[in-house]
């Protein structure tokens, strides 16, 4: 085994170890709460997954529900071990899909790399990211479109068809995800050295299959699970996208600031991708190959369009830039092979990357290793809190959860509403057009009709946009029963050493 293979495996092993032992974020709280609510559902199979609402796409809900279901076969309490097993199972599925991807990449486009090196290199690039991106929809989405690209690079028609199906499936991870199709198209043009006419001719079967698959799948979902289509349409109201809020120039400023911080500091592979892209851009400009330069820029544009349209600029949105990074590095390997005598830029880039990664590894990912004992201690202390102890004795009755998901995570009760965190009420101001929809009216009416024994309330969160009538109902019919502290860091659910908010448990006043 060559030294570079040993080094590559060593870095990959460190990345995987860091991934598995890094703290879960508060999004996992929602994922696990969702899995519990599905298990309480009176429906079976896919109907149960659809019946319980969550903002993410249907395919992504199926992925993390399956992950949680398998994890519960081994351990069923939300401990450090549960988080580790959950991420281990998720990563096993992720790497299985990555193995398929590596196998279908045509040999002529990975010449000089080899499948084993390609697997480890891609594993490093996909996992060397901020822990807020771990197992998010964007992380799965990037792997899906990399697999679609690998299939698309094959000339066989059946590969084109499967590539289109895989690519189309990203719609059910997050509905804007198919925007990455632009990166796939222009990236394939660069890799295959195609003319525009040839590329358009070749993508026709892919495009037709994409339209047919999405149309057919949406029809079937509408036919058998119409509520899912309603949820997809309603989701646009809950998110402050650029389409909802309207264009403003400050969005560009936020995009650039996020690109610098969330890409270079937290999603480390993007730094390597940008360095390689700048080198290729300068090289092609010197050779008057401006077509290549334009295609390279377009390859990076579509993930940025996704980010700016989302109008949130979360760190996991910038994870999408790993996709053009992979394409750029593949091009860089072809243009700057180490086998060419005197060609050393790859050494420079790899050295820069390794130095930067060493810094990132010591300052970002493994901080959990340094405070593991504090982490365990904090979790055990948190489990003893009065509110959680109460939750274990609440019984199996339905509860109204008026919080951001913490209540459904802590208490072992079925949600009174199918929305175990009620975005249809919390995200909607009184003047919002959504208040005229059937969804809003039904959720509001059912909430006002609640007569259960207990309810949870995260007041600062729930009353942010109004809901005065619900506030009056609570003040009149319920009394404060217990308070559960909310952690300071929104990206770190379990590391609770400071409190800045409260989840309130209310009990019905008996008249």
Please state what every model-predicted region is.
Residues 18-26, 42-65:
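Membrane-proximal lumenal/periplasmic loop motifs of glycosylation machinery
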Residues 33-37, 51-84, 170:
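Short hydrophobic/aromatic helix or loop-helix immediately within or flanking a transmembrane segment
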Residues 56, 176-177, 222, 226-227, ...:
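Extracytoplasmic
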Residues 97-105, 262-290, 296-304:
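Hydrophobic, aromatic-rich transmembrane alpha-helices
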Residues 107-112, 138-140, 145-162, 265, ...:
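Membrane-interface transmembrane helices that cradle and orient dolichyl/undecaprenyl
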Residues 130-141, 314:
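Short acidic/glycine- and proline-prone juxtamembrane loop motifs at membrane-interface regions
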Residues 144, 179, 310-341:
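Hydrophobic/aromatic-rich transmembrane helices and adjacent perimembrane loops
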Residues 160-175, 181-186, 300-309:
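Membrane-interface alpha helices of multi-pass inner-membrane proteins
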């Amino acid at each position: 085994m060559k030294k570079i293979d040993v080094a590559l495996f060593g870095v990959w092993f460190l990345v995987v170890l860091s991934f598995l032992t890094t703290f879960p974020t508060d999004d996992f709280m929602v994922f696990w709460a969702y899995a519990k609510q599905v298990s309480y559902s009176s429906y079976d199979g896919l109907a149960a997954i659809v019946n319980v609402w969550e903002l993410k796409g249907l395919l992504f809900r199926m992925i993390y529900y399956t992950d949680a279901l398998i994890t519960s076969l081994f351990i069923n309490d939300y401990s450090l071990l549960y988080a580790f097993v959950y991420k281990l199972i998720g990563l096993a599925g992720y790497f299985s899909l990555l193995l398929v991807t590596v196998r279908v990449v045509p040999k002529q486009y990975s010449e000089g790399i080899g499948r084993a090196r390609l697997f480890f290199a891609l594993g490093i690039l996909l996992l060397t990211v901020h822990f807020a991106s771990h197992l998010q929809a964007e992380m799965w989405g990037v792997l899906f479109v990399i697999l679609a690209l690998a299939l698309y690079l094959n000339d066989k028609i059946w590969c084109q068809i499967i590539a289109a199906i895989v690519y189309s499936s990203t719609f059910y991870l997050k509905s804007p995800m198919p925007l990455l199709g632009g990166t796939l198209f222009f990236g394939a043009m660069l890799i295959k050295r195609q003319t525009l006419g040839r590329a358009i001719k070749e993508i026709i079967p892919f495009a037709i299959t994409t339209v047919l698959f999405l149309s057919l799948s949406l029809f079937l979902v509408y036919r058998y699970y119409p509520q899912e289509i309603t949820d997809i349409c309603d989701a646009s109201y809950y998110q402050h996208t650029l389409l909802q809020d309207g264009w403003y120039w400050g969005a560009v400023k936020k995009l650039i600031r996020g690109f610098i911080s969330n890409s270079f500091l937290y999603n480390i592979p993007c730094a390597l991708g940008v360095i390689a892209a700048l080198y290729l851009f300068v090289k092609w400009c010197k050779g008057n190959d401006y077509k290549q330069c334009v295609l390279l820029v377009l390859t990076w544009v579509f993930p940025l369009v996704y980010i700016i349209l989302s109008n949130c600029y979360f760190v996991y949105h910038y994870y999408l830039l790993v996709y053009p990074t992979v394409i750029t590095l593949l091009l860089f390997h072809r243009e700057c092979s180490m086998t060419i005598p005197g060609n050393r830029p790859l050494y420079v880039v790899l050295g820069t990357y390794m130095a930067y990664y060493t810094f990132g590894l010591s300052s970002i990912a493994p901080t959990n290793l340094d405070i593991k004992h504090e982490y365990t201690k904090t979790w055990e202390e948190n489990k003893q809190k009065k509110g959680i102890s109460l939750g274990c004795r609440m019984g199996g009755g339905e509860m109204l959860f008026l919080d951001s998901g913490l209540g459904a995570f802590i208490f072992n009760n079925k949600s009174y509403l199918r929305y175990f965190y009620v975005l249809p009420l919390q995200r909607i101001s009184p003047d919002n057009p959504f208040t005229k929809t059937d969804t809003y009216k039904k959720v509001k009416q059912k909430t006002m009709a609640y007569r259960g024994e207990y309810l949870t309330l995260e007041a600062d969160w729930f009353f942010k946009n109004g809901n005065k009538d619900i506030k009056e109902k609570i003040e009149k019919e319920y009394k404060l029963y217990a308070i559960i502290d909310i952690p300071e860091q929104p990206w770190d659910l379990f590391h609770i050493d400071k409190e800045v908010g409260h989840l309130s448990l209310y009990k019905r006043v008996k008249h």
